[in-house]
């Protein structure tokens, strides 16, 4: 057994069938973890997506639920506990991003983003920590924030705000739950080569020029490097960390981009 061995970890990850989530799930399974993947997509679609990413391992299970809804989250935990046992690591990873100039950002889209990025993280973290306290489990919460918690990126202002708020949420859980042996940390990736950022990088020269300038290391972040951060935070190597943000952004937050 090594310090990065996760065979004693049962991990629930929300948003686990998404572009980054699938890579994280694969890495967790490769390091021996039992992984409960939560997302909103139908099970057959999720299984295909996970399989295409090489993440549909024997110790990986899928659980469909809307993580913004407390009743559904309670049912999710009941189902996970019945199937693989009570998770001792819960990753609040579900999230979304959309791009509009700040004065053109529709309020209904702002509400939807905050609902998923922030409310869901609170609902899931609260459900997990209540169960850990009841069962005297020293659990670990991991929140996915972003480098834009510190350096706002243009045209995604609500996303920037949601990630800054998520850092505060994480630190609140860490502060209040430490007496119960429960830890909370966050991971803050940079400009990852998936989803909207990758599409804009490939199709919009102005975005690529701006993003290239914002990344001191000069290239988009591979999702595998984000997964490496999750492995570290889940491992015994990070056992004395709580209330901390693991910033792995290629240097994006070192200075303003303009």
Question: Where is each model-derived feature located?
Answer:
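Short C-terminal tail/terminal secondary-structure segment
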Residues: 2, 151, 231, 242-258
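Alpha-helical segment proximal to the catalytic Tyr-Lys
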Residues: 130, 175-179, 239
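Substrate-binding pocket helix/loop in short-chain dehydrogenase/reductase
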Residues: 101-102, 106-114, 211
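Active-site loop-to-helix junction immediately N-terminal to the catalytic Tyr of the SDR YXXXK motif
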Residues: 105, 152-160, 172, 200, ...
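Active-site loop of short-chain dehydrogenase/reductase
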Residues: 9, 62, 86-87, 132-145, ...
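Canonical Rossmann dinucleotide-binding motif of NAD(H)/NADP(H)-dependent dehydrogenases/reductases
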Residues: 5-36
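Active-site helix of classical SDR
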Residues: 125, 162, 170
